[in-house]
UniProtKB/Swiss-Prot annotation:
Its cofactor is Mn(2+). Mn(2+) 1 binds at D296, E433, E471. CDD domains: Prolidase. This is Probable Xaa-Pro aminopeptidase BDBG_08406. Belongs to the peptidase M24B family.
Length: 506
């Protein structure tokens, strides 16, 4: 039985649809209800974020200067590029509009947004740009001014502060258009401060990630309900996009991966154009975006409500076990790297049972790196404003900041060098996404010390499985975790396929 989390006190954009999914009983259909609520919403906490960043800068004076994304045209074209706001700018503004900039005066605790000056021609063609009164009403900003005053305002700030004042930039290339005299340009401190701040999500951010996951769950369910009448990978992509957009999520957090059969062994497969006939599994890695916040959800499923082969079922159940054994250990203070190692050890045990690995102990096979042939990526990553979100250091890093596949699963190297590897903290949102892939290219290029433990003849019977990945978005708490992803998996997933409409085209 599957139940989706009912939205509770979510922070919703004004007049956006609310996604609800009903609890599934054995003979029920999965019903998606679309409800529009027109309510006053808490503003995105830009000022709170600015203060957090300032605290990480560890200075009581200075001016943070952030540039938003500009409107640009495609090369040799009069068509505008699809707009995507700079995520660092959004974090301190909440503004998803083009051609804006902002400053934050640390000493005065003043956040100022600069919006485009009025342009009659653009307004006639494209509609009005963000205005001062609208911006003050919508965003958590102290003052809104026009772009034409930005350079002069920065110069005036520098003059008032006196010689030696600091202007904090993300990048050297984002300096003000006009030179600002008598200021020190610091393009190193701000990024580290913002990365540290962004790694821990507040309640508003968690609400947005939760909402993105609710939309994604609805889209994944619609794919499951319709998969029996789909004939091509593009049908899966189209279904996911259709549901997402209809529920108010006009953007995807990343390019949809709808990989069937052996295509699923390509981690970031993107063509999505091959027929489904004769394929055992589809690996659908797809997540909607909500108000610039990402979801990242992967489900692997057959084209019918039955496991297509004993091998397919064995691998799915093994990946399911890998994920569950890692998730139950998530809480503040746990080293994520240890969870990754646990996933590899679970894979090795499973492969020894199935006979895919042979001729060695668990430790010998782990030390050889043989499991990397079938699980070549990390267990997961931060998620937030980016699908692979920022942090002061990678959760997969060792104490020297390095990440190496060969070193990663070798206890001889791990034991002495990872005592200070980063630990999970309450408020982080990370993915748990183990996978098993049968890639002929990986096997053909394997090192002798790896492949000697692999029964290559037996592996041939598993090649049609392609790849299996299961991925959820996990909120770390002080005592455990909350799974923000409500898309069904396992037996519940098969039940939805069984109840789905349409006859099987496979």
């Amino acid at each position: 039985m599957i139940s989706a989390i009912e939205p509770k006190n979510l922070l919703r954009p004004h007049s956006q649809p609310v996604v609800t999914t009903s609890t599934l009983q054995p003979d029920d259909e999965c019903n998606i209800e679309l409800r529009i609520e027109d309510t006053t919403v808490d503003k995105y906490p830009a000022k709170q974020h600015a203060r957090r960043v300032a605290a990480e800068i560890h200075r009581d004076r200075g001016l943070v200067y952030l540039m938003g994304q500009k409107s640009t045209l495609y090369e040799d074209s009069d068509q505008e590029r699809t707009f995507r706001q700079r995520r660092y700018f959004f974090y301190m503004s909440g503004v998803d509009e083009p051609d804006c900039d902002l400053t934050y005066d640390i000493n005065a605790d003043k956040l100022t947004l600069y919006v485009p000056d009025f342009d009659l021609k653009r307004t006639i063609w494209m509609g009005p740009t963000l205005g001062r009164e609208e911006a003050l009403q919508r965003f958590d900003i102290d003052e809104v001014k026009y772009q034409s005053s930005l350079d002069e305002d920065v110069k005036q700030w520098a003059q008032n502060q006196g010689r030696g004042s600091t202007l904090y930039l993300l990048h050297e290339s984002q300096k003000p258009a006009e030179k600002v005299p008598n200021v020190f340009i610091d393009s190193k401190t701000l990024k580290q401060a913002m990365d540290t701040s962004r790694a821990i999500k507040d309640e508003h951010e968690i609400g947005l990630i939760r909402r993105a996951n609710e939309v994604s769950a609805a889209a994944h369910i619609d794919v499951l309900r319709g998969i029996r009448k789909m004939s091509n990978e593009r049908d899966i992509e189209a279904s996911f996009l259709n549901t997402s957009v209809s529920l108010g999520a006009h953007k995807q957090a990343y390019h949809i991966i709808a990989a069937s059969g052996s295509n699923a062994a390509t981690l970031h497969y993107s063509k999505n154009n091959e027929p489904l006939k004769g394929r055992q599994f589809v690996c659908l890695d797809a997540g909607a975006e909500w108000n610039c916040y990402a979801s990242d959800v992967t489900r692997t499923f057959p084209m019918t409500s039955q496991w297509p082969s004993a091998e397919a079922k064995h691998i799915y159940k093994l990946v399911e076990h890998m994920q569950e054994s890692c998730m139950v250990r998530v809480k503040e203070g746990v080293r994520y790297l240890d969870l990754h190692i646990l996933a590899h050890r679970s894979l090795i045990r499973g492969f020894l049972t199935l006979g895919i690995f042979k001729g060695g102990t668990l430790e010998e096979i782990q030390n050889s790196g043989a499991s990397n042939l079938f699980f070549p990526h990390g267990l997961g990553h931060h998620i937030g404003l980016e699908v692979h979100d920022v942090s002061p250091e990678s959760i997969m890093a060792q104490d020297n900041g390095d990440y190496s596949d060969n070193v990663l699963i070798s206890p001889n190297n791990l034991s002495p060098c990872t005592t200070s590897s980063p630990t999970l903290k309450s408020g982080m949102v990370v993915t748990i996404e183990p996978g098993i892939y049968f890639s002929q290219i990986a096997l053909d290029n394997a090192k002798p010390e790896q492949v000697k433990y692999v029964d290559l003849e037996l592996v041939k019977t598993y090649m049609p499985v392609g790849g299996v990945r299961i991925e959820d978005d996990i909120l770390v708490t002080k005592t455990g975790y909350e799974n923000l992803t409500t898309a069904p998996k396992g037996d519940g997933m098969l039940e939805i396929i069984r109840q789905g409409d349409g006859s099987c085209n496979i």
